[in-house]
Amino acid sequence: MKKVSWIVVIAGAVVGLAALVLTHLGNPANMGFCIACFLRDITGAVGMHGAAKVQYVRPEIIGLVLGAFIMSVATKEFRAKAGSSPATRFVLGAFVMIGALAFLGCPLRMVLRIGGGDLNAVVGLVGFTLGIFIGIQFLKRGFSLKRAYPVGKGEGGVLPIVMTGLLILVIAVPSLFKFSEEGPGSKHAPMLAALLIAVVVGALAQRARLCMVGGIRDAMLFKDFKLLYGFVAIFVVVLAGNLITGSFKLGFALQPIAHSSQLWNLLGMVLVGWGSVLLGGCPLRQLILAGEGNGDSAVTVFGMIVGAAFAHNFGLAGNADAMNEAKEVVVGGISNNGKVAVCLGILIMLGVSLWNMPKTASAPVEAAK
């Protein structure tokens, strides 16, 4: 195995271990890390949505961005660039978030859920892989959001600066923010521990180019399995940890913060996989890229934040399975509004894919960021 593969394996193992530790310290079950859920919680904390159960300034998001920033500066890999179809990326980011919240998790949480025995997430993985496969068909035919261009360092540092400001405010003036008193938002690891763990994870993810989409995409497109090792390492560590601690629960019904409406688990992750291929990386990768100076990825993250606000203000997000008073399982899922949003998102992915195809002869596949 090449050296770079070991870097990816180590990074994946650390991510899996970090997720287990954060869950032990107070984060929700099977949610040691979740980019979609944590961005959604921050969105609620700053008042952009009113869902009282999912409001908290998650230091994990701040730490991931700052860890990537610190590592990229230390290794002289910080490159300020932007201008690659930012408006399109904003829209794609919003719909990737809507798809993730329909499923109740980003690709990273999908792996954590599978490691905890949640078979609904296996259905999500099928949809995720299908979405990646569809996106690859357009990459093969020359899909491109065009190149980014060098910009000033201030432009490249927008998201690290925003996250630093958010951290200062939540420490100095916590009364500015909304915090959940019950539900997933009320369950969290101590702020300092979560921040430090996330900084380490962010730094390693930057160094290893860790990406949940990239592993499957590269395996399909180039027969290159290096990034896939990270995906597998996360799963193996989380599975082992859950088996050791007795937290492993195999099945579909009543999994932590999950629903067993399988069609929408599948389609939600089709939307996430397809959109992430078009964007050049999963939600985790977008945070890391923004931390190392990519202004287009910062725009994508802002799009995801707006998508989270829309998802909860308009009732688009999934609802978990529950037990009623008669001890019967009530299957969750998404509302009619959410179903329309997911289907609309898939149509928008198709439109963006077709619109950004070369108008003449086929072009080479755009390299992943």
In which residue ranges do the predicted regions lie?
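Membrane-interfacial helix-loop segments of redox and metal-homeostasis proteins
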Residues: 1-369
